[in-house]
């Protein structure tokens, strides 16, 4: 009897008789295959086998559930090919001859083959234990380390109907979804000892070290034979043959050398060689912690990374507390140098982190951490999910970077990719065991046609283990403070949000196109993260506006802390393609405030997406080629530059002021970084004969010109100082996290927007020529007001048309539906922020006048 949980099929564990029969059949298959010889080391011994307790099945498969080895043996999609025929995506070219050339591969005599297989069979039937027992043995030390952290049990999932009564019309779908989540939690509790233990797969799979040796385990149910190869055994496939259990888990134990040293030296290259339905292939272990690409070599090599205890990086600084208002500096280590080169973790730590701190941000979000073979993918075509990118340095270098950020009081968010994976077959997960349905959906459902990548099967038990463990690994091992989950919209819908326009109709969110398995995974990972690390921050990239996306899981939501408010950046690009006269201020305010009540958003005017080649930064949209010749302060600016500098400041401030509860800026855009991002690339020859021109491998536009923002003789410096003033204004007044927000004026004729946020009053005049004297604005608090931020101040590249020391006194009488008002001067293309002050208010807030910088900066 087989039962399912949202596409996850659970077979009953096979009996001993079934096991022996399966093993006999497996051995007979290998005998008939005339396979490669895998001889056992004389000193090899088994440390006990483990079950892949719940094997992987495609949630869209209609076949009966059996053991993973029975289901996947010989399975291959019509579209798949042998390892030698696979072509790596974009910059990685498969060459099996090159890869296999350094391994001694021979066909064997029947007697030798039989002897080897008999030894393998004996190992496969001895001492089997479950993961639950393994984790129980480790629980004492782990509980000491994590301080007895517990993941709370599921709630009833009903509170979402009180939060959003419109969800009642979709109660069947939402109750079903929460029911699948609860059942999955129960199955994990029953079979794995709980979500906390389930998420420690990296302590079972991959390479694990004990006092007596190294154990290597790999889930590869489609493989017919496997061997561990590497520098340590001269890439001899006969030396270290792996044994398999009935759940597709391959294992080998390598005892320490006679002198007590590990059998695999730290820094050695390693791979797993498998005889698969697609042929013989060498793969990087799926749980590898470090991989490198030697110069001139394709593909990457896995590296056994286990430095001596005295050489391992020891964290010195505690994690900072979760900031009240989240202000994120989005960054990419490789392109963070002012020079045209790939930068390092160490240089980013020493040069960029202090800059981020000085600018006033309290969080740094780092892209492209997970290893990716194709640099120009911006880190989104991940090949090795547990390995930090070796382009930038070692794992210990990354730890040092994060530790330094913590010392500076910065939380560190990782841009994590669980929405898809690279199509690379030799250094990635694709076709890992020779089948296309191991980690991913089989057939066309497993391919993202726009991203040219593979799509995970979130209904697979082992995929859940892999991804949940991956999220925890980065929190535990590297002490990241949270994540920005990439491509969540693609995960939550089977159409992946492609060629679909979300209108806000709830039927778009809760129907047949919703991937319930994926949503349940997101609920699991958010429960895991928040249970183990209550201070962690989790941001989801969702463009659809999924209701209850940022509602706690126990209440029936998906569980994110923040949603990226992606529509705002698109709106700015749309407006920048028009004349100022065609802008509608009501359209601007609607887009900025069009978000779900009670669900926090991180807003941005532009991120890395808008800066990529083929698009333009906001600064380049505004000033175009004039940025090359007219940014020196001692040279007369063109009208285009004057307009660009003014609107650049206004766009960023109103985005922060109205758009969300958190703010994000991509590195360099704080000072209006010119041009675009173009990663080094060569010509691409497409199958249809077309050629996509490259840039001759140039790094010229794959860097950040921080020197421009620092140069006081350039107008970029004023833009950078304004951005710093914005951050300090929020740090002082906390307006982004205030529940009070009221737009009192959006005048299409005057092009004026006035709104209250927290205790501040914002006045924006978007008119291109009209300045308004004695312009009355409404306010809710009577008394005296002062200017606390003025975009027209000369320090920010403005014209100093306002007296920032002036005081403004309110008069009674309703205006713009406010109980009182006062008169201001509103120059064209300016943004001014006012704050109510007491007569005896001589605290630090008064010192912020007139520019919003910290007192020591004035």
Swiss-Prot record:
Keywords of this entry: Amyloplast, Chloroplast, Glycosyltransferase, Plastid, Transferase, Transit peptide
Predominant localisation class: plastid
Bias kind Low complexity: ranges: 58-69, 77-91
Record-level GO cellular component terms: amyloplast; chloroplast; chloroplast stroma
Biological or metabolic pathway of the protein: Glycan biosynthesis; starch biosynthesis
CDD domains: AmyAc_bac_euk_BE, E_set_GBE_euk_N
EC number: 2.4.1.18
Tissue: Mostly expressed in roots, stems, seeds, inflorescences, flowers and leaves, and, to a lower extent, in seedlings.
Disruption phenotype: Modified starch composition. This phenotype is enhanced when associated with SBE2.2 and SBE3 disruptions.
Organelle transit peptide residues: 1-37
Chain positions covered by the region annotation Disordered: 38-125, 139-158
Short name of any one Pfam family annotated for the protein: Alpha-amylase_C
Biased segments, Basic and acidic residues type: 139-148
Catalytic activity: Transfers a segment of a (1->4)-alpha-D-glucan chain to a primary hydroxy group in a similar glucan chain
Superkingdom of the source species: Eukaryota
Transit peptide keyword on record: yes
Compartments where found: Plastid, Chloroplast stroma; Plastid, Amyloplast
GO biological process, one term: cellular response to sucrose stimulus
Job of this protein: Catalyzes the formation of the alpha-1,6-glucosidic linkages in starch by scission of a 1,4-alpha-linked oligosaccharide from growing alpha-1,4-glucan chains and the subsequent attachment of the oligosaccharide to the alpha-1,6 position.
PANTHER family: 1,4-ALPHA-GLUCAN-BRANCHING ENZYME, 1,4-ALPHA-GLUCAN-BRANCHING ENZYME 2-1, CHLOROPLASTIC_AMYLOPLASTIC
Family: Belongs to the glycosyl hydrolase 13 family. GlgB subfamily.
Assembly mode: Monomer.
Protein name in the entry: 1,4-alpha-glucan-branching enzyme 2-1, chloroplastic/amyloplastic
Organism from which the protein derives: Arabidopsis thaliana (Mouse-ear cress)
């Amino acid at each position: 009897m087989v039962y399912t949980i949202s596409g996850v099929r659970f077979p009953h564990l096979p009996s001993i008789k079934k096991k022996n029969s399966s093993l006999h059949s497996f051995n007979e298959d290998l005998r008939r295959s005339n396979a490669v010889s895998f001889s056992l080391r004389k000193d090899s011994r088994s440390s006990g086998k483990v079950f892949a307790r719940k094997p992987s099945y495609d949630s869209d498969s209609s076949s009966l559930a059996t053991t993973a080895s029975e289901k996947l043996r010989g399975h291959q999609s019509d579209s798949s090919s042998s390892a030698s025929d696979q072509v790596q995506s974009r910059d990685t070219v498969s060459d099996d001859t090159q890869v296999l050339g350094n391994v001694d591969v021979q066909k064997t005599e029947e007697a030798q083959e039989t002897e080897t297989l008999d030894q393998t069979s004996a190992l496969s039937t001895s001492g089997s234990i479950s993961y639950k027992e393994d984790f129980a043995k480790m629980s004492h030390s782990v509980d000491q380390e994590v301080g007895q952290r517990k993941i709370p049990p599921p709630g009833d999932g009903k509170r979402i109907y009180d939060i959003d009564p419109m969800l009642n019309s979709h109660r069947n779908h939402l109750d079903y979804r929460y029911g699948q989540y609860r059942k999955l939690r129960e199955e994990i509790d029953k079979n794995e000892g709980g979500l906390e233990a389930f998420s420690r797969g990296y302590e079972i799979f991959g390479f694990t070290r004990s006092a007596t040796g190294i154990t290597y385990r790999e889930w590869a149910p489609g493989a017919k034979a496997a061997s561990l190869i590497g520098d340590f055994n001269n890439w001899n496939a006969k030396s270290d043959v792996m044994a398999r259990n009935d759940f597709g888990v391959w294992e080998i134990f390598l005892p320490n050398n006679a002198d007590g040293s590990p059998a695999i030296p730290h820094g050695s290259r390693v791979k797993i060689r498998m005889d698969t339905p697609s042929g013989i292939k060498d793969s990087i272990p799926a749980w590898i912690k470090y991989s490198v690409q030697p110069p001139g070599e394709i593909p990457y090599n896995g590296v056994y990374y286990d430095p001596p205890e005295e050489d391992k990086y020891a964290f010195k600084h505690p994690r900072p507390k979760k900031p009240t208002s989240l202000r994120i500096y989005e960054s990419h280590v490789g392109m963070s140098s002012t020079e045209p080169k790939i930068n390092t973790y160490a240089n980013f730590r020493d040069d960029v982190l202090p800059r981020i701190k000085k600018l006033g941000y309290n969080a740094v979000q780092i892209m492209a951490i997970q290893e990716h073979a194709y640099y120009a993918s911006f880190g989104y075509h991940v090949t090795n999910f547990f390995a930090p990118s070796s382009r930038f340095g070692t794992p210990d270098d990354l730890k040092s970077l994060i530790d330094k950020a913590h010392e500076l009081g910065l939380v560190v968010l990782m841009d994590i990719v669980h929405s898809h994976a690279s199509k690379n077959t030799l250094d990635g997960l694709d076709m890992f065991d020779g089948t296309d349905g191991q980690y991913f959906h089989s057939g066309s459902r497993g391919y993202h046609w726009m991203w040219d990548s593979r799509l995970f099967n979130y209904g697979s038990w082992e995929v859940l283990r892999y991804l949940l463990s991956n999220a925890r690994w980065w929190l535990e091992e590297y002490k990241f403070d949270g994540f920005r989950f990439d491509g969540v919209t693609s995960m939550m819908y089977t159409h992946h949000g492609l060629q679909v326009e979300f209108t806000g109709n709830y039927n778009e969110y809760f129907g047949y196109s919703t991937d319930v398995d994926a949503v349940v995974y997101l609920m699991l990972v958010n429960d895991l993260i928040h249970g183990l690390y209550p201070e962690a921050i989790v941001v989801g990239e969702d463009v659809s506006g999924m209701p209850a996306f940022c509602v706690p899981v126990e209440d029936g939501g998906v569980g994110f802390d923040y949603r990226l408010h992606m529509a705002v950046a698109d709106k700015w690009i749309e407006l920048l393609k028009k004349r100022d006269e065609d802008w509608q201020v009501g359209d601007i305010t609607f887009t900025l405030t069009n978000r779900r009540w009670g669900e926090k958003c991180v807003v941005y005017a532009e991120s890395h997406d808008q800066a990529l080649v083929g698009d333009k930064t906001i600064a380049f949209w505004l000033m175009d080629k004039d940025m090359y010749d007219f940014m020196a302060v001692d040279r007369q600016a063109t009208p285009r530059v004057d307009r660009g500098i003014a609107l650049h400041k206004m766009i960023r401030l109103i985005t922060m002021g109205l758009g969300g509860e958190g703010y994000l800026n991509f590195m360099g855009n704080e000072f209006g970084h010119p041009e675009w991002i173009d990663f080094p690339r060569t010509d691409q020859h497409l199958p249809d004969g077309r050629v996509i021109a490259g840039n001759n491998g140039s790094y010229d536009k794959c860097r950040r010109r921080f020197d421009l923002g620092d140069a006081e003789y350039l107008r970029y410096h004023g833009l950078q100082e304004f951005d710093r003033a914005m951050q300090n204004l929020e740090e002082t007044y906390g307006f982004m996290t205030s529940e009070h927000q009221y737009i009192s004026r959006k005048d299409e004729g005057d092009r004026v927007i006035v709104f209250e946020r927290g205790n501040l009053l914002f006045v924006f005049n978007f008119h291109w020529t009209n300045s308004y004297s004695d312009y009355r604005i409404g306010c809710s608090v009577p008394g005296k007001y002062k200017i606390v931020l003025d975009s027209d101040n000369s320090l920010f590249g403005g014209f100093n048309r306002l007296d920032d020391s002036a005081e403004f006194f309110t008069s009674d009488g309703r205006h713009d539906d406010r109980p009182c008002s006062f008169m201001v001067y509103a120059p064209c293309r300016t943004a001014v922020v006012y704050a109510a002050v007491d007569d005896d208010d001589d605290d630090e807030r008064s010192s912020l006048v007139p520019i919003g910088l910290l007192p020591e900066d004035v």
